[in-house]
UniProtKB/Swiss-Prot annotation:
GO BP, sorted A to Z: translation
Sequence ranges of Basic residues compositional bias: 50-59
Family: Belongs to the bacterial ribosomal protein bS21 family.
Lineage, broadest ranks: Bacteria, Pseudomonadati, Pseudomonadota, Gammaproteobacteria, Pseudomonadales
Protein name as catalogued: Small ribosomal subunit protein bS21
Region of interest (Disordered), ranges: 50-71
InterPro entries: Ribosomal_bS21, Ribosomal_bS21_CS, Ribosomal_bS21_sf
Source organism of the structure: Pseudomonas syringae pv. tomato (strain ATCC BAA-871 / DC3000)
NCBIfam families named among the record's database cross-references: S21p (TIGR00030)
Length: 71
């Protein structure tokens, strides 16, 4: 869990913003969302494999677009 020490004469809003940023960097909210409901190991593997395929297709598409523009 990220911890933020409030500096002297620091407004609460600024400290809260620093805390939110540190939570975002640590991935706390993403972790909570992923653990909100139980996901079977097979479903998790299937979801991760589908995400990998999607990332690869996106990467290939970007490379093809880049190759077309170089003339």
């Amino acid at each position: 869990m990220p911890a933020v020490k409030v500096k002297e004469n620091e407004p609460f809003d600024v400290a809260l913003r620093r805390f939110k940023r540190s939570c975002e960097k640590a991935g706390v909210l993403a972790e909570v969302r992923s653990r909100e409901f139980y996901e079977k190991p097979t479903s998790e593997r299937k979801r991760k494999a589908a995400a990998a395929v999607k990332r690869h297709a996106k990467k290939v598409q970007r490379e093809q677009r880049r190759a077309v523009r170089l003339y």
